Amino acid sequence: MIVVCAGPIGNPAARLLALLTARGHQMVKGPEALPPGEEPVVLAISDGPSVFDYLAAVQRLGPHPFRTLMLSRLGAHPDARAASLQRLWRLEEHVRAGNAPVLTLRFAPLVGAETPLWRRLRSRPALPNGGRKLLNPVAERDAIETLDRAFDGRARWEGWYEVAGPEAVTLAELRDLATKAPFSGPPADTGEWEPALEEMMEHRLAESQPWASHFGIVPTPLGAWAGAATA
């Protein structure tokens, strides 16, 4: 599948899309970089300017049939305190109003061998509120598999889903899991908060089942994440 990135794409969306090239999908930076022809494409949208001209992006696709992928994050809401989550909500609404096939995925914090959050937690950072915040982190490999199944037609291109693990864990428990796992990366690699802490503090418990059912995913169990971090 050819995936066209519309405007700036921030992480984790950019990283997930880049990893999908290993599964045979082609990433294109902007409609102008598309090869000639009428091959179907996916128009990928994520973090960008507050004002995004969806119609203009669609028009630049020319004769290519397209579907739209909205790469969002948990917590996107018009009343969110974090400006980034408000912006994502506006993008979701803007895209939904375009009357084109749209699949919206709201990603939970991603955990895996190379995720910035996992590396950050390994550095034993201080945690807000004693690390009591409950999260539904999801294995990055499950997020990649979700996108792969959407691109190759194994899941219907419709609706919105919370891509989140079924197990609730506190931020402190997640840090403990990360620090106990074997690690072969650079000792000075402290990663980063992904998403930002201010976003995670707004997370409510997610609904994992609709996502898992729609995409035929068996979420990676919490206890397997330590193994995934060294795979």
Task: Outline where the language-model segments fall.
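N-terminal Rossmann/SDR dinucleotide-binding element
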Residues: 1-41, 172
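Conserved Rossmann-fold NAD(P)-dependent oxidoreductase catalytic core, especially the SDR/UDP-sugar
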Residues: 6, 31-36, 40-98, 102-106
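Oxidoreductase cofactor-interface core, primarily capturing Rossmann-like NAD(P)-dependent enzymes
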Residues: 8-16, 79-178
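Mid/C-terminal beta-alpha module of Rossmann-like enzyme folds, strongest
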Residues: 10-22, 146-197, 202-231
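Short glycine/serine/threonine/alanine-rich loop segments
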Residues: 25, 66, 100, 180, ...
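Generic anion/oxyanion-binding catalytic loop in active/binding sites
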Residues: 26, 30-32, 80, 132-133, ...
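Conserved beta-strand termini and adjacent loop/short-helix elements that scaffold enzyme active sites
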Residues: 30-32, 105-108, 185-190
